[in-house]
UniProtKB/Swiss-Prot annotation:
Residues 207-219 have a biased composition (Basic and acidic residues). The lineage of its organism: Bacteria, Pseudomonadati, Pseudomonadota, Alphaproteobacteria, Acetobacterales. It comes from the Bacteria. It is a peripheral membrane protein. It comes from Acidiphilium cryptum (strain JF-5). The gene is nuoB2. This is NADH-quinone oxidoreductase subunit B 2. Keywords: 4Fe-4S, Cell inner membrane, Cell membrane, Iron, Iron-sulfur, Membrane, Metal-binding, NAD, Quinone, Translocase, Transport, Ubiquinone. It is found in: Cell inner membrane. Gene3D superfamilies: 3.40.50.12280.
Amino acid sequence: MRFTFGKGATGQQLSTTAPLLRGLGTAGQPAAPSPGGGTFTDAVRRNVALGRLEDMVAWGRKYSIWPFNFGLSCCYVEMATAFTSKFDIARFGSEVLRATPREADLIVISGTVFVKMAPVIKYLYDQMLEPRWVISMGACANSGGMYDIYAVVQGADSFLPVDVYVPGCPPRPDALLEGLMLLQNSIGSERRPLSWLVGPNGAEKIERPSFRDLKHQERQAAGSLPTPDSV
């Protein structure tokens, strides 16, 4: 906001912005318009950001997701491609790949999850910072894919709380970016602090219901699937 000063009829220094700051004119009338137009309230709205603390925290979290540099098989190639200049994942604030799970809050399960690898993934997930999120990328991570055998876990959600599923074999980098945007929307709409409660074991987070479970009956009742061109 700009402040200007001038001299009155008696030679006294007067501020031409003071009536605007007080919100009243010299004769009790509404303040004169500011240089940008509008009243004092309008000037405050243009120059001061107002909001709730939980909204500011949600805004900061959704645009500063730190993914863990972790991959399993071919889907990791598409994940790595999303970090190149062509797709530019930095637009969404998630370009900071962390080399240790202790500095990350997002893990992307990109590839086939073998039974021997599941305990390792769970161990890495337990070391991540709270709050933490999981993206299941590709058909193998979502449901085992084409490997319906004893050595492959049939879905990463059998041992991890998956937040977003990205379909495809393998999914394009664009699909991963769309999944990241869905995760950001979920993070931004999360209630705070009502989503955390103090229980017998300390602060506990109320788990959101899984859309996979909520839409299970709807998917089972589907008689026909749309063609890939119509999706």
